[in-house]
Amino acid sequence: FVPIWM
């Protein structure tokens, strides 16, 4: 999972 801010 990759956070939106990354």
From Swiss-Prot:
Keywords annotated in UniProt: Amidation, Amphibian defense peptide, Secreted
Localization of this protein: Secreted
Source organism, top-level taxon: Eukaryota
Residues spanning the signal sequence: none
Primary localization: secreted
Tissue-specificity statement: Expressed by the skin glands.
Residue positions where Methionine amide is found in the record: 6
GO biological process: defense response
GO CC annotations, alphabetized: extracellular region
Name this polypeptide is given: Electrin-1
Source organism (scientific name): Litoria rubella
